[in-house]
C-alpha cells in the first residue's frame, strides 16, 4: 500500500492517504453543489484505503456544516484551505485531491460530475460509506 501526502497551505492540517491505487487511477469526482464549486473541490477516496488527518494545531480545524448537516467540511482556520469532508464522527472521509503533493498527476483528468441535491441524509451517509475512505484523526502538539 502506498502512502501519499498533502496539506493545507500553512501546514496545520496535513493528510496521509494510504491506498493501493496510484494517483493516475484515483477516482475523481466533482460535486456540483455551490460550496464545492466555490472551493474547486476535486474529490477522491478509496473505500479500501485509509486517510490519517494530522492536526499540527487542533485549533486550526474548522468544521462547517450546511444543507443536510450530516457532513463536516474541514477547512483550515488559519489559511482557509478546504482539505476534505467527514461523516459519522470522522469515520469516513473524502479528500480534496488538489491539496495532495501529487496533485499534478490528477489535473487535466476528467472528473465525474455529481449532482446530489435530491438525496436524503440517510442516502448520503450510505453512499459515502460505500465510496469514501476510512478516517483517523491524529492531533499532534506543536
Model-derived segments and their meaning:
Residues 1-7, 12-142:
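A short Gly-Trp-Pro
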Amino acid at each position: 500500500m502506498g502512502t501519499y501526502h498533502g496539506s493545507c497551505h500553512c501546514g496545520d492540517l496535513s493528510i496521509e492517504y494510504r491506498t493501493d491505487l496510484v494517483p493516475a487511477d484515483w477516482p475523481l469526482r466533482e460535486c456540483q453543489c455551490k460550496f464545492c464549486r466555490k472551493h474547486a473541490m476535486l474529490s477522491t477516496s478509496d473505500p479500501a484505503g485509509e486517510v490519517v488527518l494530522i492536526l499540527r494545531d487542533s485549533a486550526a480545524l474548522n468544521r462547517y456544516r450546511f444543507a443536510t448537516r450530516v457532513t463536516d467540511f474541514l477547512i483550515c482556520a488559519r489559511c482557509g484551505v478546504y482539505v476534505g469532508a467527514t461523516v459519522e464522527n470522522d469515520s469516513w472521509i473524502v479528500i480534496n485531491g488538489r491539496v495532495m503533493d501529487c496533485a499534478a498527476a490528477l489535473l487535466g483528468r476528467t472528473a465525474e460530475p455529481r449532482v446530489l441535491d435530491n438525496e436524503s441524509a440517510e442516502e448520503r451517509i450510505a453512499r459515502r460509506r460505500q465510496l469514501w475512505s476510512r478516517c483517523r484523526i491524529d492531533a499532534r502538539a506543536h
